[in-house]
């Protein structure tokens, strides 16, 4: 397992450093603009969380935008667009803490800008915020978000970072499919944000902060936990077993 790395002197002058931070800014802006825009267009929100209406359409929109944006940005910055993903990869030693802090700052700025632009373009229409479903308490919301984000990072590791991945290049698509499935599963719980930046922008633009902390604590706990579990229990440098028994000719 990789170690947490603060970063090194001169890292900011590396050619890919600024490109990566700028990439996260642009990619997160597009991700939030499209994702929140899809929720606003559908209008299927109850207390700000996706519930009722055409939930499938919203979930499909989330799945597609994650798959496409992650694929487009993978060679630029890794296509994180999510502070929980960035922190988790820092825990796994895949990105320095210095770089990850700037990635997260870019993600928050981009999410806010995207939501303010959406409000302006729609004539002041409220940006739907993530909110706990009726009967779901804050602690339950934290656990739900932790589980959903755990599944997200587990799939990222299994389909992108593990050298034994079954379908090279398909990781972003599979990750998007999981996000769509979680969006459906989480509609009656917390809305399945899995992404503090995705929750932050709408909250800033609308001024609604009720239980907003849930969408930080849950994802930032579940993501790194998934990294620790996968790195310790499932990661291997090379194949250790045959998927099918070998037959003698």
Swiss-Prot record:
It is a multi-pass membrane protein. Keywords: Membrane, Repeat, Transmembrane, Transmembrane helix, Transport, Vacuole. One of its GO terms (cellular component) is vacuolar membrane. It is found in: Vacuole membrane. The chain crosses the membrane at residues 20-40, 56-76, 100-122, 141-161, 169-189, 214-234. Its main location: membrane. Coiled coil: none annotated. The keyword Protein biosynthesis does not apply. Gene3D superfamilies: Glycerol uptake facilitator protein. Belongs to the MIP/aquaporin (TC 1.A.8) family. TIP (TC 1.A.8.10) subfamily. This is Aquaporin TIP4-3. The lineage of its organism: Eukaryota, Viridiplantae, Streptophyta, Embryophyta, Tracheophyta. The gene is TIP4-3.
